[in-house]
Curated annotation (Swiss-Prot):
Protein name, UniProt field: 3-methyl-2-oxobutanoate hydroxymethyltransferase
Protein's organism: Rhizobium etli (strain ATCC 51251 / DSM 11541 / JCM 21823 / NBRC 15573 / CFN 42)
Cofactor note: Binds 1 Mg(2+) ion per subunit.
Cofactor: Mg(2+)
Gene responsible for this protein: panB
GO-annotated biological processes: pantothenate biosynthetic process
The keyword Transferase is annotated on this UniProt entry: yes
Source lineage: Bacteria, Pseudomonadati, Pseudomonadota, Alphaproteobacteria, Hyphomicrobiales
Length: 273
């Protein structure tokens, strides 16, 4: 591990202790340069399986592999000095059994040096989370809209509108709260329900398209920076339009090359006397 990664960082217990306090700031990171830029400003960095869509052009997160998550987890860890780093367990790496989940979670922690793993699911995954946490693996849960289940859920849509959905999310929150998870992401959930769940849980809730009452917020970094333009979720606030700025910079470079303005004398090497 690099020297920067060996310095004191926020830990899952410290994140858990932030329940009800100053809101927890979380963003996604997939690369070393981005991790370095985000680290000073974030409490949590999530190496999300959203990288499949953001970096690899996939339509969903289903095609993301364990090896991909580990590679990007390693990259992020090289750029972090302060933030707690959580790596997503990709689809198929934990659903088969709690023993398979344990083996794959151990791989992620050992090979990346990250602080915790995150997995999606409510009641059906509570036993697996408990199995992992009892064996020393910090776990963040994920309820509400679950992107890895998008193909069976009928697409990306907010949840908690019907009594059936509301009841399920309440049960999921209760199950995850009792599983030993140190925090839980609640995604794409109607605001009143997300607020209620946050109040009822003893662990921090990290909202994404949920409620300002959540104990923290997470967004995809490329979304808030305007670097990912395939689609823009309603819950995203754009803080810059870097995509346009990158395109403008590249257009200026291309023009300089074609007009032979670049490289200028300052960008070339002189023969030594």
């Amino acid at each position: 591990m690099s020297a920067i990664g060996s310095q004191k960082r926020l830990t899952p217990p410290r994140i858990s202790a932030m329940k009800g306090g100053k809101p927890i700031v979380c963003l996604t990171a997939y690369t070393t340069p981005m991790a370095r830029l985000l680290d000073d400003h974030c409490d949590l960095l999530l190496v999300g399986d959203s990288l499949g869509m953001v970096l690899y052009g996939m339509e969903t997160t289903i095609g993301v592999t364990l090896d991909m998550m580990i590679a990007h987890g390693k990259a992020v860890m090289r750029g972090v000095a302060k933030a707690c780093v959580v790596v997503d367990m990709p689809f198929g790496s934990y659903q088969e059994s709690k023993e398979v989940a344990f083996r794959n979670a151990v791989r992620i922690l050992q090979e990346t040096g990250c602080d915790a793993v995150k997995l999606e699911g409510g009641e059906e995954m509570a036993e697996t989370i408990a199995f992992l946490t009892k064996r020393g693996i910090p776990v963040m849960g994920h309820i509400g809209l679950m992107p890895q289940q998008v193909q069976t859920a009928g697409g990306y849509r907010s949840v908690g509108h019907s009594e059936h959905e509301t009841s399920k999310i309440r049960r999921d929150a209760h199950a995850i709260g009792g599983s030993g998870a140190f925090a839980v992401v609640i995604e794409g959930t109607v605001e009143p329900l997300a607020r209620e769940v946050t109040s009822a849980m003893h662990i921090p809730t990290i909202g994404i398209g949920a409620s300002a009452a959540c104990d923290g917020q997470v967004l995809v970094s490329d979304d808030i920076l305007g670097l990912f333009n395939d689609f823009k979720p309603r819950f995203v606030k754009r803080y810059d339009e870097l995509g346009k700025r990158v395109a403008d910079a590249v257009a200026a470079y291309a023009e300089d090359v074609r007009s032979r303005k670049f490289p200028a004398a300052d960008h070339t090497f002189k023969r030594r006397p």
